[in-house]
C-alpha cells in the first residue's frame, strides 16, 4: 500500500516517511490488531499541532495541515484497497486456511481457566472471546492439573485448534523475550 499513500501525499507535496521501522508486539494496539485477524494493520503517525497552530522546527504546524495529511493518506488506503482487492481477499483466506496447521505446531493445545477465582474478569474474557468467534467450553467434569483443582461448571477450556488460533495465542501468552532490540517499549503490555 505504501506507493498509494506516497502518491496521495506527493500530490499535496507533503513530506513523509514510508518504511517499516518497528515490529508490532502488542495486539491491543490498533495497527497490530488487524494483523492477528488476517488483515493488514497500518500505523500512521505524524506530528500533532496540539491546537489550531503550533511552532515546530520546520515552521508552523496547523491542525488543518494535520487533517489534510490524514485525509489524503486515507484516500491512498482506499486507492490501494480497490486496486489490490483480490490480493487482500486472498491473503485473508489463506491466513485462516492455515489456522489448523498453525495450531498443530503450537505446544499449547488449550487454555483452562477457572471462572471462580475472579468471576467478573472471567466473564469479561468470555465476552471478548465470543465477540471474536472463539469457542470456549464449560468443563464437563472436575479435574486437577498440576495440583490445581478445576471444578465442573466453574471453569472453561479454550482449545487452540480453531480459526482464531493466532489471536488466542496473542491474548493468552506472556511474551517476555524479543528477537529485535529496537521496538516501541510495549514489553510490559499484555492482554491477559
Say what each PLM segment does.
Residues 1-16, 20-26, 30-192:
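Intrinsic-disorder/low-complexity accessory segments
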Amino acid at each position: 500500500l505504501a506507493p498509494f499513500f506516497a502518491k496521495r501525499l506527493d500530490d499535496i507535496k507533503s513530506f513523509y516517511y514510508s518504511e517499516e521501522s518497528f515490529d508490532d508486539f502488542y495486539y491491543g494496539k490498533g495497527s497490530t490488531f488487524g494483523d492477528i485477524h488476517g488483515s493488514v494493520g497500518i500505523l500512521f503517525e505524524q506530528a500533532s499541532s496540539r491546537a489550531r497552530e503550533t511552532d515546530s522546527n520546520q515552521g508552523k504546524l496547523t491542525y488543518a495541515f494535520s487533517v489534510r495529511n490524514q485525509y489524503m493518506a486515507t484516500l491512498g488506503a482506499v486507492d490501494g484497497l480497490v486496486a489490490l482487492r483480490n490480493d487482500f481477499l486472498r491473503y485473508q483466506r489463506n491466513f485462516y486456511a492455515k489456522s489448523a496447521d498453525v495450531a498443530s505446531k503450537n505446544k499449547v493445545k488449550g487454555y483452562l481457566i477457572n471462572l471462580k477465582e475472579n468471576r467478573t474478569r472471567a466473564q469479561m474474557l468470555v465476552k471478548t472471546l465470543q465477540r471474536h468467534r472463539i469457542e470456549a467450553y464449560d468443563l464437563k467434569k472436575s479435574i486437577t492439573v498440576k495440583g490445581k483443582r478445576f471444578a465442573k461448571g466453574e471453569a472453561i477450556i479454550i482449545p487452540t485448534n480453531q480459526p482464531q488460533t493466532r489471536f488466542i495465542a496473542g491474548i493468552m501468552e506472556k511474551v517476555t523475550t524479543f528477537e529485535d532490540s529496537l521496538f516501541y517499549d510495549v514489553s510490559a503490555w499484555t492482554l491477559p
